[in-house]
Amino acid sequence: MARSLKKGPFIQERLLSRVLEMNQKGEKKVIKTWSRSSMISPDFVGHTIAVHNGKTHIPVYVSENMVGHKFGEFAPTRTYRGHAGGKAEKGGSAPKRK
């Protein structure tokens, strides 16, 4: 379910204030954040935000296409290592029937 329009987007205030401060100074530093639920606003474009995935911070360079999405979408929390089971034979496919 989408967030109500009267509430507006959620952006962590400290994160937004840091980015606005850096925009005024003209700096570009990596900013660490644990706020995966913060929405990306146009002020973040061009900055690199290190988003926490539960273990480490993953650097995310914000582009114009990301505006309106949330930071958590770009820092996956789960690693896929393949399904369990026997390994396939070197031939690649099952033997052919006659």
Curated annotation (Swiss-Prot):
One of its GO terms (cellular component) is small ribosomal subunit. Keywords: Ribonucleoprotein, Ribosomal protein, RNA-binding, rRNA-binding. It holds the Pfam family Ribosomal_S19. GO terms for molecular function: rRNA binding; structural constituent of ribosome. InterPro entries: Ribosomal_uS19, Ribosomal_uS19_bac-type, Ribosomal_uS19_CS, Ribosomal_uS19_SF. GO terms for biological process: ribosomal small subunit assembly; translation. SUPFAM superfamilies: Ribosomal protein S19. It comes from the Bacteria. Residues 76-98 are annotated as: Disordered. The keyword Iron-sulfur does not apply. The keyword Glycoprotein does not apply. Belongs to the universal ribosomal protein uS19 family. HAMAP family: Ribosomal_uS19 (MF_00531). Protein S19 forms a complex with S13 that binds strongly to the 16S ribosomal RNA. This is Small ribosomal subunit protein uS19. It comes from Chloroherpeton thalassium (strain ATCC 35110 / GB-78). The gene is rpsS.
